């Protein structure tokens, strides 16, 4: 038998007594049955409130609030090529305007080996500023033919693969180059 909480044990005993009394007794008037049903509902309500479960109306309210917050957030027109062109020209941009979207500028990355890892040739490479640092990791793994490569920006920290190369370059460039040191094992910390 599955162990029950104290209140459940008491309620199950009273429930079995109620069932046995109702089966052996004469039919009760509808008012008495309605009162006992009301009492049982109140008991269940108390037990549920002790569990502190969110009611369905609470979850519906939170869902509605989240949807209204999402709808209230405005999306800037600059995020869409179509909307930005429609705002400036008063209509949809032509296909020639769409093909003329400027490519992000390229940034220079200088690779410096740490320890006994070989030098990557060329030492300075250019990459699109919109690329993630994960692309740099893939490039180094292929060039060095290693399974794992640990990279450090300016010998100080290891960037995450999701970080943007352009942002790293803007913040940590030295002589207009992002200095990336690399090694086969963990070098710092």
Swiss-Prot record:
<comment type="similarity">
    <text>Belongs to the ATG12 family.</text>
</comment>
<dbReference type="GO" id="GO:0034274">
    <property type="term" value="C:Atg12-Atg5-Atg16 complex"/>
</dbReference>
<keyword id="KW-0653">Protein transport</keyword>
<comment type="subunit">
    <text>Forms a conjugate with ATG5.</text>
</comment>
<keyword id="KW-0813">Transport</keyword>
<dbReference type="InterPro" id="IPR007242">
    <property type="entry name" value="Atg12"/>
</dbReference>
<dbReference type="GO" id="GO:0031386">
    <property type="term" value="F:protein tag activity"/>
</dbReference>
<dbReference type="GO" id="GO:0015031">
    <property type="term" value="P:protein transport"/>
</dbReference>
<dbReference type="GO" id="GO:0000422">
    <property type="term" value="P:autophagy of mitochondrion"/>
</dbReference>
<dbReference type="GO" id="GO:0034727">
    <property type="term" value="P:piecemeal microautophagy of the nucleus"/>
</dbReference>
<dbReference type="GO" id="GO:0061723">
    <property type="term" value="P:glycophagy"/>
</dbReference>
<keyword id="KW-0072">Autophagy</keyword>
<dbReference type="GO" id="GO:0000045">
    <property type="term" value="P:autophagosome assembly"/>
</dbReference>
<feature type="cross-link" description="Glycyl lysine isopeptide (Gly-Lys) (interchain with K-149 in ATG5)">
    <location>
        <position position="189"/>
    </location>
</feature>
<feature type="compositionally biased region" description="Acidic residues">
    <location>
        <begin position="60"/>
        <end position="72"/>
    </location>
</feature>
<feature type="compositionally biased region" description="Basic and acidic residues">
    <location>
        <begin position="40"/>
        <end position="49"/>
    </location>
</feature>
<dbReference type="GO" id="GO:0034045">
    <property type="term" value="C:phagophore assembly site membrane"/>
</dbReference>
<feature type="region of interest" description="Disordered">
    <location>
        <begin position="1"/>
        <end position="72"/>
    </location>
</feature>
<dbReference type="GO" id="GO:0097352">
    <property type="term" value="P:autophagosome maturation"/>
</dbReference>
<protein>
    <recommendedName>
        <fullName>Ubiquitin-like protein ATG12</fullName>
    </recommendedName>
</protein>
<keyword id="KW-0472">Membrane</keyword>
<keyword id="KW-1017">Isopeptide bond</keyword>
<keyword id="KW-0833">Ubl conjugation pathway</keyword>
<dbReference type="Pfam" id="PF04110">
    <property type="entry name" value="APG12"/>
</dbReference>
<feature type="compositionally biased region" description="Polar residues">
    <location>
        <begin position="10"/>
        <end position="39"/>
    </location>
</feature>
<dbReference type="InterPro" id="IPR029071">
    <property type="entry name" value="Ubiquitin-like_domsf"/>
</dbReference>
<dbReference type="GO" id="GO:0000421">
    <property type="term" value="C:autophagosome membrane"/>
</dbReference>
<comment type="function">
    <text>Ubiquitin-like protein involved in cytoplasm to vacuole transport (Cvt), autophagy vesicles formation, mitophagy, and nucleophagy. Conjugation with ATG5 through a ubiquitin-like conjugating system involving also ATG7 as an E1-like activating enzyme and ATG10 as an E2-like conjugating enzyme, is essential for its function. The ATG12-ATG5 conjugate functions as an E3-like enzyme which is required for lipidation of ATG8 and ATG8 association to the vesicle membranes.</text>
</comment>
